[in-house]
């Protein structure tokens, strides 16, 4: 064993070779030294346990190659591009909405250059960073004003902290939602320092339930859109319009957490109907919060629209500065909202809506291309078929609603082979993320953004054998 330890080169010896000097030039002295120490520590452990050298210390060229590979891998960003073939278009784990081309360009400009973020070019003086987005939302929804923070949970927190800290907020028991990551409305209320007052039952809440709970300490009446679940059957809920009338009677604001935040009626595209921001405003809600990276199709943000005097109070709260968006997000959000000024062009320019509305025939053509490519690469090892599929919007939007789609399925009696193929998909330079149903890998085309790029990536399957 001692002889094996003696075969290990010193860090200094590696650094003083021409190859080592080249690595220092490329990656820097500290990084190369740390890498060599790491690999030598690995080698010593292997010698202790297995009584042999690791392969990369059996030959000096292998050693240099391993150091180079390790250092190059350190430079690789781990949040990397993937091919989404899950059939879930707004996939939370894969980053939700893909930005439109104009949003990408606006964000890139904001990254590279100084921009008029809080500067009024006409007046030549300081302005507010939310102004451009607020003006657009006023035009698109009819809201008096708007406020932007970094996500919808932050928007709800800001509303509660501003208007209900130390006071009570009344909400239906059937609307105490939990979203991903065990994140619950009651937890946000507790964090905001307000008291939750539940009324009604899980499946039925009446206007009188709210009325009986109102007292001198009631600060808000709250509605939460249950976008990620449905209660069916013997049910009853109070509409915003009814709640607003009750709020006016007692001079209590009504706030609505709309969640997904559609700015256009999805049913016009033969998609499942989702309440729009405009509809909630017409019903009289004082403040409405919603997400920017779900149905709206933009960057992650929490948007609050509503009455000007209430928005001004939100803007003045200390939490607003904590939760505010940076120039890149605001630039991308502005560009995304401007697409809604041309509604006839939305399915062409808004990426998420384009994916959701792709014709089945187009998806079938893509499926045929994908099947042909896979048959060529996988030979006769697997059974490939083109099948009808059911995709979904994702991100908690309309979870019960399915969207017709087309998928390529891969079957194999040996489940270990399917598992191995899935692993190969994930090791590609741009990993392929699929789903498994009924002992088949299902590659759903509804969520694919670029079939040509996917086909090129698949060529790597020939190289990993």
UniProtKB/Swiss-Prot annotation:
EC number, UniProt record: 2.9.1.1
Domain of life: Bacteria
Molecular functions per Gene Ontology: L-seryl-tRNA(Sec) selenium transferase activity
Location within or outside the cell: Cytoplasm
Presence of the UniProt keyword DNA damage in the record: no
Main location: cytoplasm
Gene3D superfamilies found in the cross-reference section: 3.90.1150.180, Type I PLP-dependent aspartate aminotransferase-like (Major domain)
Pathway: Aminoacyl-tRNA biosynthesis; selenocysteinyl-tRNA(Sec) biosynthesis; selenocysteinyl-tRNA(Sec) from L-seryl-tRNA(Sec) (bacterial route): step 1/1
Reactions it catalyzes: L-seryl-tRNA(Sec) + selenophosphate + H(+) = L-selenocysteinyl-tRNA(Sec) + phosphate
Cofactor (UniProt): pyridoxal 5'-phosphate
Record's GO cellular component terms: cytoplasm
Family that this chain belongs to: Belongs to the SelA family.
NCBIfam families: selA
HAMAP family assigned to the protein according to its UniProt record, in alphabetical order: SelA
Function of the protein: Converts seryl-tRNA(Sec) to selenocysteinyl-tRNA(Sec) required for selenoprotein biosynthesis.
Protein name: L-seryl-tRNA(Sec) selenium transferase
Native source organism of the sequence: Mannheimia succiniciproducens (strain KCTC 0769BP / MBEL55E)
